[in-house]
Amino acid sequence: MSTLEQKLTEMITAPVEALGFELVGIEFIRGRTSTLRIYIDSEDGINVDDCADVSHQVSAVLDVEDPITVAYNLEVSSPGLDRPLFTAEHYARFVGEEVTLVLRMAVQNRRKWQGVIKAVDGEMITVTVEGKDEVFALSNIQKANLVPHF
């Protein structure tokens, strides 16, 4: 997670939780039109009105604090079937589920891995890939998503 993403997470966690939602995580994607993507969840699931309420509340906070110096679009959504994983707690919650990982730095000359989450030990994640356990540092995981099965 970048310094900006950490700062944004700290700023918007309380307002999101005050509305009764869990802040699953955020992504800030820089580009011609940058995007701040916020993932929320609740035990009852998420609907469009929930996303609109969170968007309105977060927009107010960001307008006052103004932490982003470039133009951006704000997107608020549920994590979806291919739920992104951001924290060790997320990985622990989904032990036994299939995941795709993209690493910051290659391990065994590979940056992309897919396997089943086997265990979480502090900041280390064990994933079974093709029958072999591979261990990854959470700090080396750039992006992780559950693999939906239909």
UniProtKB/Swiss-Prot annotation:
Keywords: Cytoplasm, Ribosome biogenesis. SUPFAM superfamilies: YhbC-like, C-terminal domain, YhbC-like, N-terminal domain. One of its GO terms (biological process) is translation. Disruption phenotype: Cells lacking this gene show a reduced growth rate, especially at high temperatures. They show a reduced amount of 70S ribosomes engaged in translation and a corresponding increase in the amount of free ribosomal subunits. It is found in: Cytoplasm. InterPro entries: Ribosome_maturation_RimP, RimP_C, RimP_C_sf, RimP_N, RimP_N_sf. Gene3D superfamilies: Ribosome maturation factor RimP, C-terminal domain, RimP-like superfamily, N-terminal. GO terms for cellular component: cytosol. Associates with free 30S subunits, but not with free 50S subunits or with mature ribosomes. Required for maturation of 30S ribosomal subunits, probably at a late stage of ribosomal protein binding, while Era is associated and after RimM. Belongs to the RimP family. HAMAP family: RimP. This is Ribosome maturation factor RimP.
